[in-house]
């Protein structure tokens, strides 16, 4: 097994320094014809930077001031971008930040995130060193009066997803992971334009521009299943684990006999 990529710092949005306009230059006495220089257009699909980390940091700054997202009036103010190693071969994508994610400005740090971390560790990987985690929407969806929303969360609407999905697609273009795990139906819809139940989409790989995508249940679904008793909770966890075994196999990760039998 290849040595996991080196750890990268948690990526957070940084405000851009104020733009300084250059001083006007005196006109030249004569204009000599010359060939126009060739320049590369800077865009979300072609972010500036010499490393993946620099490109991701630039994307985070663009997401911070996303006028299309903020202009909806249905999202809260705090931008939560991503966490993990830009050199990772495995990427997880969820739907949107919740209360804890907004408070800590990091995706998947609440109860569902803690369960995701356990899944990652059970795969024999480390968070954040070996993986990269992001969301379809970078702002927590607003529910009622923002001042009294408290811990209440909701899934993003199709309009909110359409405004924000360009950022996670740009991240994928930079990271170029060898596999993506779409956590829940919202992530599947945003990445793959698929609708329907996760049960109908999971268990097999889908294609996103040549990158295999495994759709599986969101960790919050597994937490809700625990309320239905241990038998159902174990059965649903086994389904997710079977999906992760397929991902591990695709990535060439070692799978022990003990790992094969988890939740069986």
Model-derived segments and spans:
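A polyanion-binding, active-site-adjacent surface
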Residues: 1-264
């Amino acid at each position: 097994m290849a040595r996991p990529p080196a750890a990268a710092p948690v990526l957070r949005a940084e405000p851009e320094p104020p733009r300084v306009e250059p001083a006007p230059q005196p006109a030249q006495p004569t204009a000599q014809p010359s060939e126009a220089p060739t320049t590369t257009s800077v865009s979300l699909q072609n972010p500036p930077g010499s490393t993946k980390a620099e490109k991701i940091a630039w994307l985070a700054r663009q997401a911070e001031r996303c006028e299309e997202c903020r202009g909806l009036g249905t999202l809260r103010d705090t931008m939560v971008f991503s966490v993990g190693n830009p050199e990772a071969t495995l990427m997880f994508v969820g739907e949107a930040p919740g209360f804890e994610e907004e408070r800590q400005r990091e995706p998947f740090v609440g109860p569902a995130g803690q369960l995701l971390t356990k899944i990652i560790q059970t795969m024999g990987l480390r968070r954040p060193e070996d993986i990269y985690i992001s969301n379809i929407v970078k702002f927590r969806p607003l529910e009622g009066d923002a001042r009294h929303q408290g811990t209440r969360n909701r899934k993003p609407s199709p309009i909110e997803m359409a405004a924000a999905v360009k950022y996670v697609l740009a991240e994928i273009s930079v990271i170029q992971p060898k596999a993506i795990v779409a956590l829940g139906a919202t992530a599947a819809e945003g990445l793959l334009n698929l609708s329907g139940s996760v049960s109908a989409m999971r268990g097999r790989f889908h294609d996103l521009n040549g990158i295999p995508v495994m759709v599986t249940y969101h960790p919050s679904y597994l937490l809700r299943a625990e309320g239905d008793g241990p038998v159902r909770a174990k059965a649903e966890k086994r389904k997710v684990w079977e999906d992760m075994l397929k991902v591990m196999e695709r990535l060439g990760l070692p799978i022990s006999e003990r790992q094969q039998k988890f939740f069986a």
